[in-house]
C-alpha cells in the first residue's frame, strides 16, 4: 500500500510480478458493487451497564457483541490506535482487556495490511470471528474470503458502522503536529520533531453529553485538550468534506451493500422519534441485516434496553446510510496547502463562505423579511 499526495493509501501492483490473474480487481469493493438491501429489523438500543455506555461512543452495543464472541473462545477484529504515531490500524483481540482498544469511534482510515489473512487463519481453526469495520472494509473482507471457497464463513460475524467517510491520514498527522506545537509553545509538551507526548486520544468524550461530544487529547503532563466537535479544526474539516477520501463521495457500499450481518451507529434524532429512550448518555442504532446477525443479536438483547424503530427513522438521522456527501469546493486546495499552513487557520480560511454563498444568504434573509411584512 502506497500513500498518494493526499495521504490516502492505495494498492500498488508490482508489474514485474503480476501474472494478470485479475484477483485484485475481483476483490476490490469499489469495482464490484452489490445490490442494495433493506434490514430485517431496526432497533434503538442501549446497554443496561451505564459505565459501559459512558465508555462507548453511543450505546455500548459493540462491547456486548464482542463479549459474546470472546465467551466462545473466538477472536474480535477492529480498529485501534497505533500509539507510536496515533494512526489507526486493525488488530485482533482475544480477551476482555483488549476490547478497550477497539471501543470508541475513530474517524480515520485504518490500515488493514495482513489482517484479512489473520481472519482467514482464525476461521480455518474453527473458532468464531467478529470483524468490525467500515462498509468498504466489510465488503473487501467478503470478497477476499470468496476467493478461498475452501474456508467456511459460518462462524464469521460481520458488523459495519454507518460511515460518513474516511479522512486523510496525512491531515490527521498535520493536526497532531499542530496540537503538539501548541502544547510545546505553552511549555507543557514536546515539539513534533522531538516526539509526541500524547497519552490518550478520544474522538467522543461525553463530558457535555452524547449529542455534544468532544474530541480529547491527554498529554504526558496530564493536561487535556478538550473541544466540542463543531469547534475542533480536524472535526470541522472532516464533517465539512474538506479531507475525505475521493471514493467516499461516491461510495459503492452504502444502502447496506457491504454484506454485513449487523450495522451499528449513533441513533441521531432519537429525541424526536423516541424521546422516552433518550437520556443523552448514548443510544445506538442497530440494523439487523441477516439471519446470522439476528442470531447474534438475540444472544445480547437481554443486556440491553431495546425499542423497535423504522428504517426511515434510521436514515433521517444517518443519511450516510443511503447517500454519499459531496466534496467541499475547497477540498483539493486544502489538501495541497495542508503541509505548509498552520492547521487551524487553514481550516477556517477554507470553510469561509464564498461571495456567492453570502449573497444568496443575504437575499434569502431579505426576501423572508419582506414576506413577513406583507
Regions from the PLM with identified roles:
Residues 1-13, 22-39, 261-262:
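Iron-sulfur cluster-binding cysteine motifs and their immediate structural context
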Residues 72-75, 180, 196-374:
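Long, compositionally biased charged/polar accessory segments in the mid-to-C-terminal portions
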Residues 89-114:
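Glycine-rich phosphate-binding "P-loop"
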Residues 57-61, 83-84, 131-141, 165-167:
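Gly/Ser/Thr-rich loops at beta-strand to alpha-helix junctions
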Residues 98, 146-161:
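A short alpha->loop->secondary-structure connector
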Residues 12-31, 60, 136, 245-251:
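Cysteine-centered iron-sulfur cluster-binding motifs in ferredoxin-type domains/subunits
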Residues 162-174, 205-209:
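Short, conserved secondary-structure transition motifs
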Amino acid at each position: 500500500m502506497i500513500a498518494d499526495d493526499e495521504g490516502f493509501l492505495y494498492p500498488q501492483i508490482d508489474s514485474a510480478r503480476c501474472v494478470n490473474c485479475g484477483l485484485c480487481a475481483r476483490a476490490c469493493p469499489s469495482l464490484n458493487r452489490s445490490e442494495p438491501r433493506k434490514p430485517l429489523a431496526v432497533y434503538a438500543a442501549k446497554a443496561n451497564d451505564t459505565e459501559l455506555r459512558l465508555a462507548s461512543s453511543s450505546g455500548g452495543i459493540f462491547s456486548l457483541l464482542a463479549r459474546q464472541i470472546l465467551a466462545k473462545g473466538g477472536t474480535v477484529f477492529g480498529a485501534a490506535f497505533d500509539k507510536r504515531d496515533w494512526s489507526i490500524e486493525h488488530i485482533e483481540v482475544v480477551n476482555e482487556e483488549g476490547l478497550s482498544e477497539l471501543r470508541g469511534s475513530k474517524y480515520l482510515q485504518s490500515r488493514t495490511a495482513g489482517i484479512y489473512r489473520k481472519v482467514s487463519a482464525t476461521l480455518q481453526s474453527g473458532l468464531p470471528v467478529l470483524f468490525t469495520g467500515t462498509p468498504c472494509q466489510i465488503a473487501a473482507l467478503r470478497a477476499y474470503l470468496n476467493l478461498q471457497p475452501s474456508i467456511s464463513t459460518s462462524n464469521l460475524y460481520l458488523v459495519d458502522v454507518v460511515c460518513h467517510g474516511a479522512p486523510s491520514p496525512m491531515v490527521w498527522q498535520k493536526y497532531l503536529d499542530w496540537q503538539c506545537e501548541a502544547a510545546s509553545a505553552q511549555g507543557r509538551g514536546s515539539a513534533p520533531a522531538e516526539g509526541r507526548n500524547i497519552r490518550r486520544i478520544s474522538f467522543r468524550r461525553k463530558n457535555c453529553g452524547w449529542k455534544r461530544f468532544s474530541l480529547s487529547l491527554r498529554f504526558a503532563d496530564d493536561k487535556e485538550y478538550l473541544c466540542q466537535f463543531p469547534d475542533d479544526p480536524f472535526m470541522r474539516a472532516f464533517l465539512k468534506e474538506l479531507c475525505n477520501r475521493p471514493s467516499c463521495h461516491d461510495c459503492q457500499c452504502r444502502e447496506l451493500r457491504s454484506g454485513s450481518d449487523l450495522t451499528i451507529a449513533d441513533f441521531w434524532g432519537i429525541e424526536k422519534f423516541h424521546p422516552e429512550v433518550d437520556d443523552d448518555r448514548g443510544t445506538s442504532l442497530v440494523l439487523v441485516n441477516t439471519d446470522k446477525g439476528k442470531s447474534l443479536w438475540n444472544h445480547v438483547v437481554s443486556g440491553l434496553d431495546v425499542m423497535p424503530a423504522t428504517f426511515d427513522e434510521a436514515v433521517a438521522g444517518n443519511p450516510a446510510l443511503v447517500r454519499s456527501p459531496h466534496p467541499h469546493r475547497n477540498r483539493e486546495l486544502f489538501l495541497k496547502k495542508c503541509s505548509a499552513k498552520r492547521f487551524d487557520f487553514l481550516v477556517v480560511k477554507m470553510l469561509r463562505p464564498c461571495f456567492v454563498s453570502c449573497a444568496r444568504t443575504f437575499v434569502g434573509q431579505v426576501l423572508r423579511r419582506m414576506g413577513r411584512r406583507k
